[in-house]
Structure formats: structure tokens, C-alpha cells
Amino acid sequence: MAKRRGGRNVTGVLLFDKPAGVTSNKALQQVKRLFGARKAGHTGSLDPLATGLLPICFGDATKVSGFLLDADKRYVVTCKLGVATDTGDAEGTERDRAEVPALDEEAVERGLTGFRGPIDQLPPMYSAIKHQGQRLYDLARQGVEVEREPRRVEIYDLQLVAVRGDELELSVHCSKGTYIRTLAEDIAQALGTVGHVCALRRLGLGPYQDPAMWTEEMLAARAEQGREALDATLLPMDSALQQYTGVELADDLAYFVVQGQPVFVPKAPSEGWLRLYDRGGNFLGMGQALDDGRIGPKRLVARR
């Protein structure tokens, strides 16, 4: 008989403020233990050096976490010029040095122009991408470097916040799959030097833009007030899906959807993902518009 997973049933999304020096998985496990939750998952890793928004999905909300993995992100990043590291950030070992040319805001702005819109990035060796079944970062730690194919990403917005000596502070709004470390290195090269990320903070992800976040200390204080106070920090799972159109279903249609059957909904959108609700406003899950005009249920949540 399979061993029953311990913990309690908790459902919702926590907007966690990850501290520096902690891996995303370690942060997840710490928060999961604090909630005593049976099931939880994060929505895409932040580098250990990075701080900021790490949405953690509990219970049924893990079924919609993939939509956040595909979402756009916003960061504030500080790039240290003149020194390159093997990891592309301050946690790595120095691998190169170069003089930093005299830079003012106008010169930096000229350098940034080529990094707005669609760009191709070469994934760093210190990344979770797999090569013949092995993570690139595992190969990198063995001193092995392999060829990587460039990947197309999009920089929706890139702004210079400040120039402070040999450091640049930038705000970045980018598509999924963008490596900020690679972006910082490429910008440094465009400015005639080398560089690495020395500070990185994620401020937004998908529908969550500049949200209130919870630190581990804040959560611990809530936990001392009891489970009800702790659970009040969670957002409903459909908060992660506000970029998609919501559709209210009549009672008979909601019944069929819950059974996993496609339904025809008059005047519903004819393409894309859709949030599905019953007449009581209860979130049923995600559906997808089908070619025949019906809505097919794809990610249903448990009925209680």
C-alpha cells in the first residue's frame, strides 16, 4: 500500500518574498512546513542570489501553476561592470576582467537600444536546461562546456534606473525563458567591457505586478496567531489566471464540465484558455476553446 502523504489540505497562492542566499526549492520546503501543507509547488526558480516574488501554489492551485511558468516577468537588476564570473552573477568565480569605459546615461542608453524587443540569447552553462539528460549546471561544475542553441526571448521594456560608477541599475520586463544574467553580460559587452549580476529582485510575474509579498518572518508571526491567520495570507487560485477571460456556466453546463465533457456556451470566446465558473461564482478550472465552438475542460479543480 502506498504511503499516505502527511500534512493538511491547503489551497491557494502565496506571494512569497524570497530572501537572498536561498534556493527556490529550499524556500518552498520552508514555507510548506510552516503551513503544514500536504502539497505545494513553486512557479519557476529564482537564482539563489535573487530576491523577490516567488509565487507558491498549494493544493489544487498546483494545477494552474504552469500558467505562471509561462507568464512574463519584471525585475530590477544591478550589473557590476569590469568583472565577469563563470556563473554570470556574484556567486561565481572571476573569469575575466576588463576596463570600464567612461559611461554616462546617454552612452548607456545607446547600448541598451539593441536589447529591446525580440532578441536571441545563448543560455548560460549555469542553467537548468538539459543536454543529453544532464543539467547544464551539473556539467559546468564538472568543467564541461557544451554547445547551446540560441533561444528567442522578448524584452518588452528595458529602462536605465541609475549609473553608479561601475554599476548599472536596470528595470526589465521580459518574456518567459529570459536569462537576466545573460542579458547583463551581453549589455556589458555592448558597452565595451564585461560584467555580471550583483543584485536581482523580481517585482512582478504575470497578473501579479508590484504585489504585497510575505517574508518568512511575516509568515512566522502569522503562524503564531494560528492556522486561520496564516491561511489568510493566501490568494484564491484563480488570482493566477486573471489574464484569461472568465466564463460563467449555467447549472447544466457546469455539471457536464465537472464530468470532463466539452460544452457549447453561447457568445463565449472562440479561442484560447478560459476561466470557468458556476453560477455561484465557484471556480471550476480552466477550459480551452475548441475548433468546433465548444469549450473543453482541461484543468479542473476538486469539488468539495
Swiss-Prot record:
InterPro entries: PsdUridine_synth_cat_dom_sf, PsdUridine_synth_N, PUA-like_sf, PUA_sf, tRNA_psdUridine_synth_TruB, tRNA_sdUridine_synth_fam1_C, TruB_C. The active site is at 47 (nucleophile). Pfam families: TruB-C_2 (PF09157), TruB_C_2 (PF16198), TruB_N (PF01509). It comes from the Bacteria. Keywords: Isomerase, tRNA processing. It catalyses: uridine(55) in tRNA = pseudouridine(55) in tRNA. Gene3D superfamilies: Pseudouridine synthase, PUA domain. It is an enzyme of class 5 (isomerase). GO terms for biological process: mRNA pseudouridine synthesis; tRNA pseudouridine synthesis. The keyword RNA-binding does not apply. Its EC number is 5.4.99.25. GO terms for molecular function: RNA binding; tRNA pseudouridine(55) synthase activity. Belongs to the pseudouridine synthase TruB family. Type 1 subfamily. Responsible for synthesis of pseudouridine from uracil-55 in the psi GC loop of transfer RNAs. This is tRNA pseudouridine synthase B. It comes from Halorhodospira halophila (strain DSM 244 / SL1). The lineage of its organism: Bacteria, Pseudomonadati, Pseudomonadota, Gammaproteobacteria, Chromatiales. The gene is truB.
